[in-house]
Amino acid sequence: MGKFHTTLPQSHIPWILSQPVFFVSTAPLSPQGHINVSPKGTFPNINSFGYIPSHDSDPRKPAQFWYLDLSGSGSETISHLYEPGNGRITIMFCEFRKAAPRIVRLFGRGKVLENGTKEFEEWTKKEGVEVIPGARSVVVVEVELVGDSCGFAVPVMEFRERREVLNEVFRKRVERAEKGVSEESMQR
């Protein structure tokens, strides 16, 4: 049986921050549009995602979850968040390790801070986020509701390693751009 919380229980935060993968889901407002679900890998050595609790100075301000969005395939999540009147987003974490089963969903409204903008620069500096090559944006989610369910049907899987392919592609692009190879512009 699932439970819903208006705030994220403090006991969940270390668990969330230990996850090697999470899933992001958005949808357009149009009934003809498709729901988009994207897996997101995390990075152990950089501050690539996190949780910002509500501020005591304004308890009405919701807590926030954020992640560093990298270039790669499409940018459907961003296009859904930019759609006028939309902004709906769900972040889902699952326990795949041999630990107590659990699924946590963060429901909220997302905002895109695009790389190259003043807002992105100020936000990443304030939050101590290392901007790596290929970082297209930061997605900030104002968490409106937290769903917590058992996860009894989620399989147990062993995490082996992170894929470094995308990071390596962008590292090489930076090297070529620094050598003056103009056709190798950095995508955001």
Q: How does the language model describe each region?
A:
Residues 1-188:
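Binding-site signature for planar aromatic cofactors or substrates
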